[in-house]
């Protein structure tokens, strides 16, 4: 197909995520390393890691080899009543990566199709555990605002009910309990203590589990908070006999500069969701990890959830290799370097009118504006600098592949700063037109 034919069919017929039909989309013909090649010949740095998944860049040779070798043997087989080596190898790796000095923290793994599905399954686990341990009245969940956990119905029910993207579903979704958004990184000890006291007031007898994104809230606002707060929530869950469900789909596998933002800070969730970078961005897969205690308490012990492509051997083989790469540890130096380079490269954004905050953690960089940004203007400004980003709400942000060079990260920084300037200019124009 020609680029024009692709665009014509796309515009006329294809729905894209979080977009109305007919929205403009750039045709991509090839990816390699940190780059996207467009149909018109332009090359862009993928500063989003294709929605935070391609941590090792596109087309990593070890992942390509794993995919080729597996597809020649077995691309798919049902997971009901059958098993296979890729699933066993991946499970072994996940249990090892999430283990501590005293041994494994987890003993059970559910392989899901996507991050949203993993949260859905984790919620089922928590509710089944409550019933199985004699607490059927525990049928609600507690979370904090500004969170995002996915687009399926149970996952949507624990996303921010007002400021999130699922507010249209109020009255249809299960009603959960919401604490205020957590105090941001750098909050005082007194602020954290006051927040945790308020959080505890919501831990009524009907709460089965607390659901949080630890340290970084992703698509709900790219907000950072301190690990001490997560430790405080863990203590409250233990005190009240409530399960802690941690969504590390975005943060897991090194994105923040830590392997996992819970475990690396001394917090062991009862249920842990991981995904995105689990396959290095090759294909969709996620996992839910839990303990023997939770598994034994569930009634019935079977989880009534069975996706057609659960445990897909092709996805598992690639994920096993991707988690081998993570286990080798190069991501530690890579994310330390990216954090340094992004901090320097994004600093000029602080001088732009309308910038509310600039923050960096590991391989995450955020420029937050004081107003909702014009997505078209900001995206185009970055593309003009040879970089692909996807702003949302007030946030212009980047989660680059770990394999980016210093020059590439600095180019990303210049593009994000240019996007912030474009957002400020577009906002000013809108204000002047409204006068």
Specify the residue positions occupied by each region the protein language model found.
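Conserved N-terminal phosphate-binding loop of PLP-dependent enzymes in the Aspartate aminotransferase
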Residues: 1-435
């Amino acid at each position: 197909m020609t680029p024009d034919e692709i665009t014509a069919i796309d515009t006329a017929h294809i729905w894209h995520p979080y977009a109305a039909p007919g929205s403009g989309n750039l045709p991509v013909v090839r990816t390699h390393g940190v780059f996207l090649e467009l149909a018109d010949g332009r090359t862009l740095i993928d500063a989003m890691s294709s929605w935070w998944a391609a941590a090792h860049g596109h087309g990593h040779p070890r992942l390509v080899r794993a995919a080729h070798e597996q597809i020649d043997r077995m691309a798919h087989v049902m997971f009901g009543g059958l098993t296979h080596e890729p699933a066993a190898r991946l499970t072994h790796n996940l249990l090892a990566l999430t283990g501590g000095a005293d041994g494994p923290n987890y003993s059970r793994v559910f392989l899901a199709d996507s991050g949203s599905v993993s949260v859905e399954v984790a919620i089922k686990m928590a509710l089944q555990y409550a019933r199985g341990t004699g607490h059927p009245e525990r049928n609600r969940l507690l979370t904090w605002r500004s969170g995002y956990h996915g687009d399926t119905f149970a996952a949507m029910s624990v996303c921010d009910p007002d400021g999130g993207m699922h507010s249209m579903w109020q009255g249809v979704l299960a009603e959960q309990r919401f604490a205020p958004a957590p105090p941001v990184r750098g909050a005082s000890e007194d602020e954290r203590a006051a927040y945790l006291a308020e959080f505890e007031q919501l831990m009524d007898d009907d709460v089965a589990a607390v659901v949080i994104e630890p340290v970084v809230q992703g698509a709900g606002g790219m907000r950072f908070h301190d690990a001490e707060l997560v430790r405080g929530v863990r203590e409250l869950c233990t005190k009240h006999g409530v399960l802690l469900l941690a969504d590390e789909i975005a943060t897991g596998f090194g994105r923040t500069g830590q392997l996992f933002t819970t475990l690396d800070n001394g917090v062991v969730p009862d249920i842990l969701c991981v995904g995105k970078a689990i396959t290095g961005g090759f294909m969709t897969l996620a996992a839910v990890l839990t303990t023997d205690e939770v598994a034994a308490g569930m009634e019935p012990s079977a989880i009534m959830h069975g996706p057609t492509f659960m445990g897909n051997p092709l996805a598992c083989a690639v994920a096993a290799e991707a988690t081998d790469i993570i286990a080798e540890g190069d991501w530690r130096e890579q994310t330390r370097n990216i954090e340094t380079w992004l901090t320097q490269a994004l600093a000029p954004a602080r001088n732009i009118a309308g910038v509310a905050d600039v923050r960096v953690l590991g391989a995450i960089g955020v420029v937050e504006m004081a107003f909702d940004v014009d997505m078209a203007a900001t995206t185009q400004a970055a593309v003009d600098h040879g970089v692909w980003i996807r702003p949302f709400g007030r946030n212009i942000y980047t989660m680059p592949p770990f394999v980016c060079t210093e020059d590439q990260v600095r180019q990303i920084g210049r593009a994000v700063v240019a996007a912030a300037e474009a957002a400020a200019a577009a906002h000013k124009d809108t204000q002047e037109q409204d006068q």
